[in-house]
UniProtKB/Swiss-Prot annotation:
Residues of the signal peptide: none
Known glycosylation sites: 22, 124, 332, 361
Stated induction or repression of this protein's expression: Expression is positively regulated by the thioclapurine cluster-specific transcription factor tcpZ.
Function: MFS efflux transporter probably involved in thioclapurine export.
Protein's UniProt name: MFS thioclapurine efflux transporter tcpA
A GO-annotated cellular component: plasma membrane
Species whose genome carries this gene: Claviceps purpurea (strain 20.1)
Segments traversing the membrane: 32-52, 75-97, 103-123, 133-153, 161-181, 193-213, 234-254, 265-285, 307-327, 339-359, 370-390, 396-416, 427-447, 500-520
Residue ranges with Polar residues bias: 13-24
Amino acid sequence: MATVGTEEKNPIGSASNTAEPNVTEPQKQYASGFKLTIIVISLCLSLFLCGLDQTIITTAVPIITNDFKAIEDVGWYTTAYLLTTSSFQIAYGKLYTTLSVKMILLMALAIFELGSIICAAAPNSTTLIVGRAIAGLGAAGIFPGSTLVLVHAAPMERRPALLGITTGMFGIASLCGPFIGGAFADGASWRWCFIINVPLGVITAVIVTFFVFTPVDPLYAEWTFKDKLAYAKIPEILVLVAALVCLVLGLQWGGTTYAWSDGRIIALLVVFAVLTTAFLVLQVLLPKSRTIPTSIVKNRNIWFASIFALCSSGAMFIAVTYLPIYFQAIKNASALSSGVNVMPLILGFLVMSIISGVITNTTGYYNPSMFLCTILASVGAGLVSTFDVGTPQPKWIGYQALLGFGIGFGLQQPIVCAQHVLDERDVPFGVAFINMMQMLGGAIFVAVSQNVFLNGLANGIAEALPGFNTHKIIEGGLTDFKNLFTSDQLPKAIPVYAHVLGQVFLIATGLCVGTLLGSLGVQWRSVKKAKVTEDQADVERK
């Protein structure tokens, strides 16, 4: 069985000077029956936790911005979470490779719980953003960890269907999230959106502790803990994190808080370019500092799958962030009602994520689901961008459902692709890389959407209401902005708000169209053939 290159296997210290042990791999033993059921339940709980945390806040954001008077932070509550989630995917992938998957997963759950507690107690918007970033750091390990437990527990031919179930549970959480978040925001407090994570996280940790077993790869058994930690390349990851923070700050502040020509915006974008260049130089010139394994860098399927993941996930996060705003600000819905109104999107995603797993399991190919995603999501997002003040219920239900169907077909396929085209020892890196691109798509394009939203709103109001002080809009909340206008001004302001949201959804449309590049680039390879190869390898070991 091929392994990653030498530069990725030997970090520093004693392990790097020790010859690789001659390890005879035992026949792979997979879980079945009751044990496999318990494992799948634990994975469903962990992904339910993450899925709930991603969407439960969406319907509460307008009320949060009203409380903190921070409409300019509307995107940060999502971006901060996704930024840390995406940036540390590869670091977690390396930790999962050399250390116990179970141990790292429990650590990630603990970090996630800490972030949730900080969010629940946040006295201001800045503290809430910090808490979201910490929770995202924990979620970064939960996503790949749950998938890798499944890799250890189930044979290849069963993984697509089981992955469909676990992804479906993520979808169920996503479905429940807006409804639960809206109920908390209207009835009790938006802080309960984060308090609820504590008991759910504890239950998940208990099940993982007592029922999940993931052996450490014998290839790394002789490595010291210091060597294993060095292998994660944390300093290099921090360079990437700093670069992404500069990019996001530049994209969110440019044209709103500061002019694009302002020295601070220029400095942020220049620092982003310098740090990104430094990160790439480390990857090319210093093999021992390489964060992304050579086997992944040279694999075209991973790169095209990553493009697909970046675009599809970016579109999904834009939709779940701004659709509740549309319903609350334009349709005068309560937080709870807006959660109900976005259910066509989430339910469509849920249903098709499960069906796509069955299709892949039946046909042996993940490519058809990727093309269906491109077609349906592009049409659905384009129709959603036409939402205005008078859009009737049948249209906003059907258009959302179509978008959800499309994204549901494709969102899990890049992960299935990574599991299929990579050697088993490279799967942790591949899954982590795909997850990183998914979260990065949300972080970047939600930031872009916030910029378009705030700029468009300020410029649109200035044009519709000459002489109006647009700075009042930035200093207010998402829904109480209506109190800024007189009864004569409001009929002119609301259509501007709706038009700007339509521009935001056009960004999602462009991303859905962009998934076509990934769909075309991924090679057609049968998952069923992988099963035959796996069986032959088991026979040879015997």
